[in-house]
Amino acid sequence: GVTDIPKTPDEFIDALKKIKDKTDAIPLYTNYAAGWTMGAWDAYIGNNATGDNTYFNQKFLHTKDPFKDYGDGTHPYAVYKILYDAVAGGLTEDDYSTTDWEGSKSMLNNGQIGCMVLGSWAYPQMEAAGENADDIGYMPFPISVNGEQYASAGADYSYGINVNASDDEKQAALIFVKWMTEKSGFSYNEDGLPVAKSSSDTKLDFSGVTFLEDEPAVEGEEDLLNALNADSELNVNNGGNDKIQAIIEHAANGDESFDDIMNEWNQKWTDAQESEGVEITE
C-alpha cells in the first residue's frame, strides 16, 4: 500500500496505481464537470512547482516557453502532466463528464475516492461530509525542488473598519477583529494556517514544507499578467478552466500528446509576449 506521502510526480502516480490495484476506490477524482474545480491545477505552478515566490507574478511573464519540460519534475509542465498521466493511465473516474462536485465530498469521506486536487479551503467540507473525518488528510502538492517541498500561503478575506464610524463603533469593531483573529480559532476550525503570528495551531501536517507567499508584480507590470492571459486566452490562474478540461479530454481520448498540448500553450504565450512587447529574460 501507500505508506509515505508522495513528494514527486512519479511517486504520486505510483501511489495512484497502488490505490487502483489494491482497492475499489477511484484513485484521483478530477471533478471535470464542475468546471471551476479545474482552476486548482493552475494554483500550483508557482511556489509549489518552483520554490520561487517571484516566479508567478514576475518571472513567468518573461520566461520563454514557460510550459516546456525542465526535465526534473518541476515547473508548470510537471504540474499539468500529473493530470494528463493520471487520466491516460486510467487512474481517474471512468467517465469524466459525469463527475459530481457535491457528491464527491461524501465519496472521499467514505473511501470511494482516493484523492482530489483542491485548495485547503475544501478540507473542512470533506470532513463534514460523513462520519470519517479522521480518515481525511491534506498533503502538499507532490513536487520537490532540489529535494525540498514548498507550499503557497495566502491571506483570506481581510477585515476593514469604517473610517466614518463613531469612535465607539470603531472600538467595538477593533475588539471583534482581535477576537476573530486571536481568540475565535476560526482558522484552525477551517483547516487553515493561524492568523496570529504567535500561534502555531493548525490541523495541516506540513512538517518539512516551506511556505511561500507570492511576491507582487514589479512596478509598471501590475497589469501585464492580465494582458498576457487575455492575449493568449490561457487565463492561467484566472478562470482558464477550459484548458485544464481539454487536458483531461485529450488524455482520455488519446488524440493529442501532452507535449503537443504544452507546445500549443507555449506558442500562445510567445505570441502574447510579442504582442505586449515583453522582454524575454530566460
Question: What are the roles of these predicted feature ranges?
Answer:
Residues 1-5, 89-91:
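Aromatic-glycine-rich donor-binding/catalytic loop that engages nucleotide-sugar donors
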Residues 8-15, 37-41, 76-83, 104, ...:
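Stable alpha-helical elements in mature extracytoplasmic
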Residues 13-65, 113:
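Extracytoplasmic/periplasmic solute-binding protein
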Residues 14-21, 102-116, 246-254:
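Short helices/loops that flank or line small-molecule/ion binding pockets
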Residues 14-18, 60-96:
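Glycine-centered hinge/linker elements that transmit conformational signals in sensory
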Residues 22-26, 58-69, 88-89, 155-160, ...:
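Flexible glycine/proline-enriched surface loops and loop-helix/loop-strand junctions
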Residues 40-41, 48-51, 78-169:
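Extracytoplasmic/periplasmic substrate-binding proteins
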Residues 119-132, 144-243, 276-282:
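C-terminal lobe and pocket-closing loops
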